């Protein structure tokens, strides 16, 4: 207990050092202190060892377990692994604080949360909104039950429901419309049900595209919602989502030799480290996953579309790049075309992007709603040839 208290204080101090506690929402820091992370962490956590997730049990190694709970402010603690994939986590404190600040919950607000997980975020919401004001939807019955137990132990009055978050509140449940809606998992498309179940002027906050955090305000007539990207946020996708992790590259390539191969002169470092470019590519090429790494030779980048096409840029010791592609699409060319569009548009930053959602469609725009971002997935020329 003494070790946990020390880790809590250190975690709080580090958040203060990086200015992670939002000045506009002082209640968040108080709520976090009242509802510490360890009270919602299961006794088994999971740690990536470079090849697979391995269990870390509290009763076997309490020190390592506590270290995962109160580790980096920028890394989540994995709480469930199914089929080798992480499917639930205790979100990192910095992102939790950012999302709650964006949501702007007020006392008395009716709040819908999609993705209960450990129940910790729902408890923080209830701390602010008040008893009985939060409904949380969880697709996994086991996670939902464990969350109910933890919420009960901490005295948080939250109504946890098993259901599909994409449908929002089950029709038999109370509290429609909601003042605030928040998703704790990433989506590629904001479900219209979320907009329907939010009052005019209400707010929806969700991770989008596995990279950005979007805050939307529902229009006065309830027929649309719009808003801007608020920052970076890397969350797990919705269960059953077609969007796979960057690690899908090995599965998609499946050991096959390249169908196309050539050398090029490119500075690949922005593809790996420039998150403004990375977000733009996520918008322009929504089904292309990008991963990269840097070593003594330079930066290498891997692309895949989660199904049948892949590309790789391998850094060479002479400063050049070996470009390899396989599958029906020329992904290297598609990325180059999208990169050129971003450059020609003035290299818009993450915060320049906005989103509009209607019953018929939704789209991303830059600066003004009329400047609609294209989707560039065909007709690209090979890179460097």
Question: What is the meaning of each model-derived region?
Answer:
Residues 2-112, 121, 143, 317, ...:
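Class I SAM-dependent transferase core
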Residues 218, 281-385:
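C-terminal lobe and adjacent flexible extensions of AdoMet/dcAdoMet transferase-like proteins
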Residues 22, 36-40, 183, 339, ...:
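Short amphipathic alpha-helical segments enriched in hydrophobics
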Residues 182-298, 378-383:
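Class I SAM-binding transferase module
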Residues 88-205, 217:
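Conserved nucleotide-cofactor-binding alpha/beta core module
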């Amino acid at each position: 207990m003494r070790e946990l208290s020390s880790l809590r204080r250190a975690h709080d101090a580090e958040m203060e050092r990086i200015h992670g506690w939002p000045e506009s929402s002082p209640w968040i820091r108080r709520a976090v202190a009242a509802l510490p992370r360890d009270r919602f962490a299961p006794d088994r956590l999971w740690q990536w060892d470079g090849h697979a997730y391995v269990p870390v049990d509290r009763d076997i190694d309490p020190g390592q377990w506590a270290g995962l709970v109160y580790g980096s402010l920028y890394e989540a603690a994995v709480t469930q692994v199914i089929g080798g994939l992480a499917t639930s986590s205790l979100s990192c404190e910095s992102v939790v604080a950012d999302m709650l600040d964006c949501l702007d919950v007020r006392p008395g607000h009716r709040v819908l949360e999609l993705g209960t997980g450990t129940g910790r975020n729902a408890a923080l919401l209830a701390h602010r909104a008040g008893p009985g004001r939060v409904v949380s939807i969880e697709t996994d019955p086991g996670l939902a039950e464990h969350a109910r137990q933890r919420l009960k132990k901490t005295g948080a009055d939250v109504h946890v429901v098993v259901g599909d978050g994409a449908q929002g509140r089950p029709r038999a449940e109370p509290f429609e419309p909601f003042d605030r809606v928040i998703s704790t998992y990433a989506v590629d498309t904001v479900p219209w049900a979320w907009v329907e179940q939010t009052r005019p002027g209400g707010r929806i906050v969700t991770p989008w595209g596995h990279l950005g955090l979007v805050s939307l305000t529902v229009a006065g007539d309830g027929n649309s919602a719009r808003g801007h990207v608020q920052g970076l946020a890397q969350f797990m996708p919705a269960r059953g989502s077609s969007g796979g992790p960057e690690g899908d590259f090995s599965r998609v390539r499946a050991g096959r030799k390249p169908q196309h191969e050539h050398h090029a002169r490119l500075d690949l470092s922005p593809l790996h480290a420039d998150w403004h470019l990375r977000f733009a590519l996520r918008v322009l090429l929504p089904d292309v996953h990008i991963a990269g790494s840097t070593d003594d030779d330079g930066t290498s980048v891997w692309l895949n579309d989660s199904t049948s096409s892949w590309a790789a840029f391998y850094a060479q010791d002479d400063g050049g790049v070996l470009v390899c592609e396989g599958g029906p699409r020329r992904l290297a060319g598609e990325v180059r075309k999208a990169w050129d569009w971003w450059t020609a548009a003035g290299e818009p930053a993450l915060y320049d992007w906005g989103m509009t959602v209607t019953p018929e469609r939704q789209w991303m725009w830059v600066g003004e709603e009329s400047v609609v971002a294209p989707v560039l997935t065909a007709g690209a020329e090979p890179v460097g040839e």
